[in-house]
Amino acid sequence: MKITALEGQKISELSMIEVAHALLEQNGKEMQFSEIIRAIQDYLEKSDDEIKASISRFYTEINTDGSFIPLGNNIWALRSWYAIDEIDEEVIALDEIEDEEEEKPAKKRKKVNAFGIEDEIDPEDEEGTKETTEEDMSYDTQAEDEDKDDVAAYDAELAEVELDNVDEEVDIDVEDDEDDSDDTDED
């Protein structure tokens, strides 16, 4: 293979990027990445092992070099072949496609109860389903029952007490403390 743009230069001093640029310029059309690699290997007379060792560095360089443009499906061309407006439109078109994909409504996810299944039976909620024993009662329930028992016992004791010398009609006069103090001062 002969590349006219590189005539007169030492092949051993040429980089793969320089050869790829001259190759695309001479062909005047887009090329597959694999075709570019084969043509570079033939022109630089490199072995398969040498190409395999340098292919990742070359791919990085072709991506970062501003003179190449990827057209998709691993097809490459020279950026100078395309007007700036065309390149911007292609980029905008890709952005619009990405935006349309993002606008698709996402599937609604089912809400998950982080604390377990809602239908799970809680034994504390089933107080009325079995007879409660003293062991099952809480402290508050026991104290309330004991208070009722104490009041009933006190009332029973009061009923049994006989009051001696109690008149049926008892008048209770409520006097002010001030009146009492006045009465005592006068005496």
UniProtKB/Swiss-Prot annotation:
Region of interest (Disordered), residue spans: 97-187
Subunit structure, as described in the record: RNAP is composed of a core of 2 alpha, a beta and a beta' subunits. The core is associated with a delta subunit and one of several sigma factors.
Compositional bias segments (type: Acidic residues): 117-149, 157-187
Disulfide bonds: none
UniProt keyword terms in alphabetical order: DNA-directed RNA polymerase, Nucleotidyltransferase, Transcription, Transferase
Protein name, as recorded: Probable DNA-directed RNA polymerase subunit delta
Organism: Lactococcus lactis subsp. lactis (strain IL1403) (Streptococcus lactis)
Gene Ontology MF annotations: DNA-directed RNA polymerase activity
Family designation: Belongs to the RpoE family.
Domain of life of the organism encoding this protein: Bacteria
Its job: Participates in both the initiation and recycling phases of transcription. In the presence of the delta subunit, RNAP displays an increased specificity of transcription, a decreased affinity for nucleic acids, and an increased efficiency of RNA synthesis because of enhanced recycling.
UniProt cross-references to InterPro entries, sorted A to Z: Asxl_HARE-HTH, RNAP_delta_N_dom_sf, RpoE
PROSITE patterns: HTH_HARE (PS51913)
Pfam family, one: HARE-HTH
Gene Ontology CC terms, in alphabetical order: DNA-directed RNA polymerase complex
GO biological process, one term: DNA-templated transcription
Domain HTH HARE-type: 14-81
